[in-house]
Amino acid sequence: MADPQVAALGVVFTVLLVFAIAVLLALRVRRVRPPGPQPFDTEPANRPLAAVVVNPTKFVDLEPVRATITSVCTALGWAEPLWLETTEADPGTGQSTAALQAGVDVVLACGGDGTVRTVAQVLAGTGVALGLLPAGTGNLLARNLDMHLNDIEGATRIALTGDERAVDVGRILIDDDPEERVFLVMAGMGFDAAIMANAPEALKARVGALAYVIAALRALKGQQTRVRLEMDGAAAQHRRIRTIVVGNCGRLQGGLVLMPGAELDDGLLDVVAIAPKGIMGWLAVTGRVLTRRRKGHHRVEHWQAKLVTITADSPQPAQLDGDPIGDARVMEFRADRGALVVRVAAPVTPARAFDTGGDA
């Protein structure tokens, strides 16, 4: 074979060899290449799911709220949340039960204290976490957990990614009603309940927290009532009171602390009885609340117990977590320690303090 032909065959063979090697390398690279990110909707079963139990009466326009919550869920890799609106006939019990049956990872209560309490009653003891999206006037549990108010986006992020904290639940039987109810912050009878009853939703919608001030002025002229107080099986005590409150935590609106020793997770209920006389008496009591002094005034008494029974001489206005529930004469309380799991903001560590959460 002539040299030019040999040379040509050599060139062809070399080209074919190089081509074959290139193909093999390409196939190898293709085999070991890691898979790229997959769209979330390819494996929906693997994405965590939240349910939102929302009180629509707390919003003028609900659609932006829903859009914000959904946007946060999808941005954090969660499935689109279940959206369950409360009604006048069902303020959250059926909706929360449906959420549990759907196997959700967390239930977000979006509304006022009544919505939060109703959802908590269903979740207590289940281990399923409660997320708080404060949208009421009081927002008492959120205040006692140091949550930011009026921030649906931030609250949603905490509800989905925050730490879990087991808190106590107060349980209560009222008069002859066999159904046990729950409260998360405070419950009681007398002056405080009269304030809640005289601050209707329409007034709160117009003037906000000022509605409670107006209602308090209306209730100042009420009379004292006699109550029998029993705690943890000890001998009964009798008092004349204007109001008696049993608390799971102690902070009210405006930073006021009615029960400085109350803790959400100590397994104890705090009891405070207030019996001022006249305007000067109310001023003295108010001073004790403002200065957070637990002792030293004979018109303000504090106790702690796991079991508390209050029996009034006559039916008195009563309230649960700031919601009026009509009149009651006998209220039996017990502390259910650590019964409810709540999502709270993670504590700020030095590392987190420098983390802005985004690009510079």
Language-model regions, residue ranges each:
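Short glycine/serine/threonine-rich phosphate/pyrophosphate-binding segments
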Residues: G92, G114-V119, L140, V167
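Catalytic core of DAGKc-family lipid kinases
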Residues: A75, T86, A124-A129, L133-R242
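ATP/nucleoside-binding phosphotransfer catalytic cores, i.e., glycine-rich phosphate-binding loops
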Residues: A2-L27, M231-H238, E263, A273-A360
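Short acidic/glycine-rich loop or secondary-structure boundary segments that cap or lie
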Residues: D192-I195, Q237-R239, L252-G255, I279-W282
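N-terminal glycine-rich "phosphate-gripper" loop used for MgATP/nucleotide binding
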Residues: A109-D113
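Glycine-rich phosphate/pyrophosphate-binding beta-alpha loops
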Residues: G188, D192, V245-L258, P324
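Gly/Ser/Thr-rich active-site loops/lids in small-molecule metabolic enzymes
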Residues: L203-A211, G254, P260-G281
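ATP/NTP phosphate-donor binding region
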Residues: M1-V107, T349, D359-A360
